[in-house]
Amino acid sequence: FTDDAARAESLCREIGREGFHRRIRFFAQARIDDICLNPTLPGTLSTAGFAALYFGAESGAGTILDYYRKGITPADMERCVALCVEQNLTPVVSFILFGPMDTADTIRETLALARRLFENGAEIAYTEMLIPYPGTPIAARLKKDGKYREAGEVYFFESCRGLEAEHILDLLH
């Protein structure tokens, strides 16, 4: 929603002009880097009746963020959350746990970042498994590494690097 800040601001002005912000609560998805590049946008959205923005942070580990080609850092996530909270807009953040490159250390980094974001006002929406859909760059990398699997229309990858089931449960406690 926020990839074109001028368009989002124009829409917010129209919402305000029509008075929709007094009757309707809006929610949208956004990119963390868009908010960092347009630091007043959360306030504009809040004034127009937006209650929350949903962000895919994906990981608290720089190596995993690079693997997903996010183009952001954990510091960007913290700045984005602060900008939203300061401007009365709830940031809702989601993460991917146990991705193909995750290790015990990267999962710990992600959980630590999620805790910091929550303590600073973010809602943590969910964590999910990565689905490597056919034709995506991640599926291509997994195929190249011999880790990609398909079963009918179910797409998955071999288990996390060195993370057996009992170790995964230990990380979550």
Outline where the language-model segments fall:
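A structural motif corresponding to the C-terminal lobe/cap of the Radical SAM core domain
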Residues: 5, 12, 16-173
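Glycine-rich Rossmann NAD(P)(H)-binding loop
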Residues: 1
